[in-house]
Amino acid sequence: MSARPFTRALLSVVAPGGTRGLSILVYHRVLPHADPLFPAMVDARRFALQLEVMARCFNVLPLPEALARLRSGTLPARAASITFDDGYADNEAVALPLLRERGLHATFFVAAGFLDGGRMWNDTVIEAVRLTPRATLDCGFLGIGQLTLATPAGKRAAVDLLLGTLKYRPVHDRAELVARIATASGAALPAGLMMTSAQVRSLHAAGMEIGAHTVNHPILATLPAPVARGEMASGRDALEAITGGKVRLFAYPNGKPGQDYLPEHVGMVRALGFDGAVTTAWGAGNDLFQLPRFTPWDRSPLRFALRLAHNLTYPAAQAA
């Protein structure tokens, strides 16, 4: 048996359909070219290869259809859906043409507050480290001293340390600290990393699904309940105003069950009238409001498909 029929047969065993075996892939960026600083990031060539695997080995469904078929128990074998988080401009500029060439559908979960010239805090950190003309970065105000940036490895280590240090800080404190990092770097930070409203409309006009991802991408578990609910509702309302269509799906920011969102947030998603929601937990699950997502990191097409199959062999974590 050749690799492709073997892979399809294996996937049919672990993803038999009905109410089991939906693979949901999650992407963030699709770069036009490989990034020398972060070579593991997905670029157009790698994304195209992964789409070929998806088209050949899976039954790729729009996520709303996949949810409806999970609910009715009619999911086909080897079912999969493709999603993107945050709202990067390259989703429309780079990923959309590749999806359309292959007749594939994706859902784009957009954090509405960063559209039209905004930049997420983590990207400010990444670009400050990437573009600084300096060989060191003084981060004594964070309690981590001076970071050495003379090599790509040093820059990668600095980014990892800074993101880990800042991730769970209160939103306003984090914004102030990130601004200090940007100033200390002396870098000219890029604009245009995130989509414009026109690009969101372009995705919608192309038949892609637009999903809510809050306004400011906060970690919901750190917010008072009314603020968390407001982030969910306002993000949805902003996207509906942009597209003129209904926003039916939600993605929890950061998305780790029990850490980044809690059972109360699942209840909020239901109460707000969403049809379903997705997490970043790995594994298999069929709770329509806590659907896990996973994207293999393998460059080999066969290994990519096999790792997706393996991911479906154990249950995903849930907030409750």
Task: For every predicted segment, state its role.
Residues 82-130:
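Gly/lys/ser-thr-rich phosphate-binding loops in alpha/beta enzymes
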Residues 115, 216-218:
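Short, catalytically relevant binding-site loops at active-site mouths
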Residues 103-116, 150-164, 258-264, 286-302:
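Short secondary-structure transition/capping segments
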Residues 50, 95, 196-199, 265:
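Residues within well-ordered alpha-helices
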Residues 25, 75-76, 88, 93-109, ...:
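CE4/NodB-like, metal-dependent polysaccharide N-deacetylase domain
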